[in-house]
């Protein structure tokens, strides 16, 4: 039976929801259509709960718009349908690849002239709230190089996708104009090339090399700190490129003005274009990243496993993908199915280390310092808003970042009942949805505790 209702809904949702969210939550749903209802079957409890919480209302609206006289009833269940089975992905092979075969697959395909990694594209970049602006700005640079945002400055912690985005811009530029001169390099390479040019009395050739490009993509500019001659040369190169409307993209591990040992004139010029932060990915994006990576590798990763890994690994994408590689490798070597229990065992030492690093005591100290109150205030019976709100934040963070039960968390906060902790978690969730300042506070605390 053709699911015309669901197909129409899906077409609308495809216009409204980013691809990674569609692939993670919507496309796994299987539809069963009857006269007065549309039943959507989710592959597991995680997908079911997420769809109910985030998409059910919108799907109901779309159904009502299609049949305003007799709106079909939406039903969400766990199950599967042989009629609308999703395409299967390859299962994890239990055969250990030979070292030579593995070596052939490991190096990324690169362009010798540009140093670009052709695997880093916009298609393989998973978009989320944490990197949405950075991706949009990068796309604009591709559309209008040298004029839209010049320079484009991306900053954020290690392993958050800054380099991926920079390569994606370069690759997209070359697809549009294969003759374009796009050069990617690490700032350390710029310094090394300059030193070599000085040693061989070839500084003019060095200048021509870096100033005759259409786009210069330079990674980790914090490496220039306290290197006065390198900063001097880059300053003039930077000016020459901007005067010629040649695109400059830079990355850094922190906001440019926070880089000690970097000349003020450079910091000032870096702010001429657009400066964008990339934050650690939120839970939904982390799940999408894992599912996307598994799909690229041809691995059938259950949603509940992706959800488990994403809940426990929060710091950056590099560690997230590293955890996935470890789980997949263990499955290959042992021939076992990837389940949540198998994943817990495969990541046992990693999770144990994380549990040691993030404790309720650490959370209480961090929250107290953030709100400029005492830890004793968090544990007290005081109920003023200046104390209650930080206490609720700390309880919610303890629930998210540790494996302690609600009663254990309540006990650590002055012997409170588990229902108090549950209320605090729900309160923080609703406040974050309503107040962007509280959401920012929570994100800041989460980032501090996770890195």
Curated annotation (Swiss-Prot):
It is found in: Cytoplasm. GO terms for biological process: DNA replication initiation; regulation of DNA replication. Domain I is involved in oligomerization and binding regulators, domain II is flexibile and of varying length in different bacteria, domain III forms the AAA+ region, while domain IV binds dsDNA. Plays an essential role in the initiation and regulation of chromosomal replication. ATP-DnaA binds to the origin of replication (oriC) to initiate formation of the DNA replication initiation complex once per cell cycle. Binds the DnaA box (a 9 base pair repeat at the origin) and separates the double-stranded (ds)DNA. Forms a right-handed helical filament on oriC DNA; dsDNA binds to the exterior of the filament while single-stranded (ss)DNA is stabiized in the filament's interior. Oligomerizes as a right-handed, spiral filament on DNA at oriC. ATP binds at residues 159, 161-163. Residues 115-331 are annotated as: Domain III, AAA+ region. Keywords: ATP-binding, Cytoplasm, DNA replication, DNA-binding, Lipid-binding, Nucleotide-binding. Its main location: cytoplasm. CDD domains: AAA, Bac_DnaA_C. Residues 1-82 are annotated as: Domain I, interacts with DnaA modulators. GO terms for cellular component: cytoplasm; plasma membrane. Residues 85-112 are annotated as: Disordered. SMART domains: AAA, Bac_DnaA_C. InterPro entries: AAA+_ATPase, Chromosome_initiator_DnaA, Chromosome_initiator_DnaA-like, Chromosome_initiator_DnaA_CS, DnaA_C, DnaA_dom, DnaA_N_dom, DnaA_N_sf. It holds the Pfam family Bac_DnaA_C. Residues 332-451 are annotated as: Domain IV, binds dsDNA. Residues 82-114 are annotated as: Domain II. PROSITE patterns: DNAA. One of its GO terms (molecular function) is ATP binding. SUPFAM superfamilies: P-loop containing nucleoside triphosphate hydrolases (SSF52540), TrpR-like (SSF48295). Belongs to the DnaA family. It comes from the Bacteria. HAMAP family: DnaA_bact. NCBIfam families: DnaA. This is Chromosomal replication initiator protein DnaA. It comes from Alkalilimnicola ehrlichii (strain ATCC BAA-1101 / DSM 17681 / MLHE-1).
